[in-house]
């Protein structure tokens, strides 16, 4: 993309409970470029919503669940965090998404450089796993 796009975080509030189709109409009225799918508590989207997002001619991004911590001490939390990122990327990719966003982790009273290196390593591992599972069309930054 070679322009700055303006998106809403989720469906505009004015759409009420009318879903993505109504949301996209409001985005058109507001002259906005798209929206971020908000997978705040889990990567879930109904078939009807998938169809509406897939048919949209708007820029789509996605926000992974908040329960991500690539600096977790517990292996099960690390695995679940990686899985949440991969699921978000896969769904975003399926729906024509441009990119995903996630909060990578917490300091847990550790040294900043250690935390940075832990998270960087896990992001590389996650990206490699995702590339093996399904080559993504998502924009990928340098790690």
Segments from the language model and where they lie:
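Active-site acidic/histidine proton-transfer and metal-coordination neighborhood
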Residues: 71-143
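N-terminal pre-domain/capping segments
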Residues: 1-64, 68-87
